[in-house]
């Protein structure tokens, strides 16, 4: 029995979703691979696109595309990029008319959170910030064993509480939440419980200076080569 194909855009070489055609032409999916979502789910795509007809959603999407456009410029040398993400954050928040911003950060990035808060305040925003250890709840509360504590079994260690972070952000009624360096998994919970518009300034990567793509760029090197090694069945 043939294996049912799933969506695999990452392995597509055709890119029919971004064709090199004129603006008045109609994109074709004739060359789309069988795993292309434009082949597999045309009705779903049509239904989802209708969401952009909602005025608030349409305007948000429009502003996001304008922001994308403004981050590039054509020069004599060709196309070049213009702004780092922190400047984009400021520009986009201004475009949206946001005034109050909320930073949910990892305590390990306290210095970065302070710097970010100062920068945003200097740009005229009201800024609140809440760290991951808010509540000072012991890790034992979620079933962590003494030997699983980073500080050691004999010491107190507060659990990271992204749910509390999210609820504080919610009750503060910020216009935009900014996630800064939350651990993997903790970021997932924050996203699940946050009920206001949210963006990510940086994610946690303890080895690469919070730049996880560095591991991909170095995945063929001696040190990171283990990332490209295929797992044997016995390792599963």
Regions found by a protein language model. Give the residues of each.
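An N-terminal assembly and electron-transfer interface module characteristic of large anaerobic redox
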Residues: 1-236
């Amino acid at each position: 029995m043939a294996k049912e194909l799933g969506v695999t855009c990452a392995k597509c070489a055709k890119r029919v979703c971004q064709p090199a055609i004129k603006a008045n032409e109609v994109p074709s999916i004739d060359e789309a691979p069988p795993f292309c979502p434009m082949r597999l789910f045309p009705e779903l795509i049509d239904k989802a696109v209708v969401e952009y007809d909602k005025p608030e959603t349409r305007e948000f999407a429009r502003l996001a595309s304008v922001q994308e456009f403004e981050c590039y410029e054509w020069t004599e040398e060709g196309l070049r990029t213009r702004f780092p993400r922190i400047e984009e954050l400021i520009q986009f928040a201004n475009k949206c008319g946001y005034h109050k911003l909320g930073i949910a950060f990892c305590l390990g990035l306290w210095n970065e959170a302070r710097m970010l808060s100062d920068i945003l305040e200097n740009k005229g925003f009201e800024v609140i910030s809440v760290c991951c250890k808010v509540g000072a709840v012991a890790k034992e509360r979620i079933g962590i064993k003494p030997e699983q504590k980073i500080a050691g079994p004999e010491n107190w260690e507060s659990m990271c509480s992204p749910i509390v972070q999210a609820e504080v952000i919610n009750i503060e009624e910020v216009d935009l939440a900014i996630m800064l360096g939350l651990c993997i998994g903790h970021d997932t919970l924050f996203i699940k419980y946050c009920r206001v518009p949210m963006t990510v300034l940086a994610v946690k990567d303890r080895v690469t200076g919070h730049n996880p793509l560095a591991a991909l760029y170095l995945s063929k090197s001696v040190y990171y080569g283990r990332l490209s090694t295929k797992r044997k069945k016995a390792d599963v």
